[in-house]
Amino acid sequence: MLRMFNTSLVASKLMWVIFTGMLAPTLYMVHCNSTLLLEWNLFSISSTPMMMTIILDPLGLMFSCTVVMISANILKFSTIYMKEDKFINRFTVLVLLFVLSMNMLIFFPHLIILLLGWDGLGIVSFILVIYYQNPKSLAAGMITALTNRIGDVMLLLAIAWTLNQGHWNILHMWAVDENMYQALVIIIAAMTKSAQMPFSSWLPAAMAAPTPVSALVHSSTLVTAGVFLLIRFYNFLSSVWWFTTFLLFVAVSTTLMAGLSASSECDMKKIIALSTLSQLGMMMAAMGLGMAHMAFFHMVTHAMFKALLFVCAGSFIHSHMHSQDLRWMGNLTKQMPTTTSCLIMANLALCGFPFMSGFYSKDMIVEASLYYPHNSLMINLILFAVGLTAFYSTRFTMCVVLSPNNCGPYMHLEESNSLTSPMLLLASMSVISGSALTWILPLKQEMMMIPLDQKLKTLMLVTLGALMSWFFLTTTNMTKTCLYIRHPIINYFSCTMWFLVPLSSQFMMKLPMYVSHNYLKLTDQSWLELLGGQGINNVSSKASNIYLASLKSTPMNYLMMSSMLLLVATLVAI
């Protein structure tokens, strides 16, 4: 019988076997640039065929390989991180269900079957967010579930409206004006799943889940499901005249908000979550600029270094008694050299440093935005968000590497093989995946001829953001000023994600709670008590006391009673 902490190891080996079996067909399909479509006609309802459709195309196979490979590394990482957990078997099964739901979303282009994978992601994510069963996890799970249910309802509406076309196959959608509302609900569904504004507040809250789950969610499964859905529907959605403008505005707003919020956050996992939100906005912006293939390219490369970031953060958290506060970290280069090196590589890839994986995808998106004619305000905001990414990534790295060590003297900092081997594999992919994908992916990107100053603008902004972060950290107290903005209003505005956290959760319940509290004080605990139980008790007590006082056998009482009876008899006789 397997020991409990080996369950994740067995699942990790299973994922590696599946990845090895999928690798050769994926490379063949990508090389041939061909698609295999399998259809089974199950039955018909009012001349509408119910068909089970499976699509094996280069995009789906490549992304599925990415999901399986990252899952294998994260399950290997879980063997140490979740070693002391009593329910490791349940955790492993939930992670495998998560991977299964994502693959259903990838390979089934039928809207009804796709809904199974879509709902599966939402249900399993809710169970994993509340995994630790404390008040914080339960509150985070509630806002995660409710926000994702909005997307589920939108997808159900899309299924109902697609019935007008006589099928539910997303590969053959009719681009007509009457389908504008259908396009709108699909976009809203993708926005809720990928946490675009104004549905962004659930993403940092979902950090209440275990760190391996966060690594899987933010790299290649839950939050990328909305982006992948838009990529599947892109040919249909691009026919709607307002699609690109609306999506670009939402994406740029989300990227800017996430960058500003990450610059003032001190929770390690929330910083990485907000960086995920920023990169999701970059993918959406790429589709808003008309480059769905570049959005997919960035989604794959981002999955590699974001999984690496979470695994490195999980290693730090595991070594610091599960503390996520950056103020505990510092001077970890000598104690944890492999983890620190991998963290630096992941942050360089996130910033878009030359020849890292993020450089080939993110830099190309920014260059394309400068090359093609678009709204200059949106382009400048994208460039500003690129600088913010370098700012908070450098701040994160310096707080871990250069700040003084504030952890307890009895902390046991270790780097076991189960922690370092997934890091090294993901670190190698964070370096080579960008250049490798440019060789094998059919990106269909034309040669962009832009001036040298425009070409270097991204690199200059990355350098400027890193230098500004270094300047602020070295000229002030690193353990304090690097973690928050001193002005309280700006700090609250930034940490609450432009007030999205109170508006999306507390706003809807604050007024009912206030009214119900006043109702409780004014009715249940006031008038109803005075006129109800307490009032009846007081009246009955007084009447009882009067009656009991009249029954006391004293001569004066007898004299008074005799006088009263004599008076009554006299009155009656008269």
Curated annotation (Swiss-Prot):
Keywords: Electron transport, Membrane, Mitochondrion, Mitochondrion inner membrane, NAD, Respiratory chain, Translocase, Transmembrane, Transmembrane helix, Transport, Ubiquinone. GO terms for cellular component: mitochondrial inner membrane. Its EC number is 7.1.1.2. It is found in: Mitochondrion inner membrane. It is a multi-pass membrane protein. Its main location: mitochondrion. This is NADH-ubiquinone oxidoreductase chain 5. Core subunit of the mitochondrial membrane respiratory chain NADH dehydrogenase (Complex I) that is believed to belong to the minimal assembly required for catalysis. Complex I functions in the transfer of electrons from NADH to the respiratory chain. The immediate electron acceptor for the enzyme is believed to be ubiquinone. PANTHER family: NADH-UBIQUINONE OXIDOREDUCTASE CHAIN 5. One of its GO terms (biological process) is ATP synthesis coupled electron transport. The chain crosses the membrane at residues 10-30, 50-70, 87-107, 111-131, 141-161, 181-203, 211-231, 240-260, 280-300, 301-321, 340-360, 381-401, 423-443, 458-478, 489-509, 554-574. The lineage of its organism: Eukaryota, Metazoa, Spiralia, Lophotrochozoa, Annelida. It comes from the Eukaryota. Belongs to the complex I subunit 5 family. It catalyses: a ubiquinone + NADH + 5 H(+)(in) = a ubiquinol + NAD(+) + 4 H(+)(out). One of its GO terms (molecular function) is NADH dehydrogenase (ubiquinone) activity.
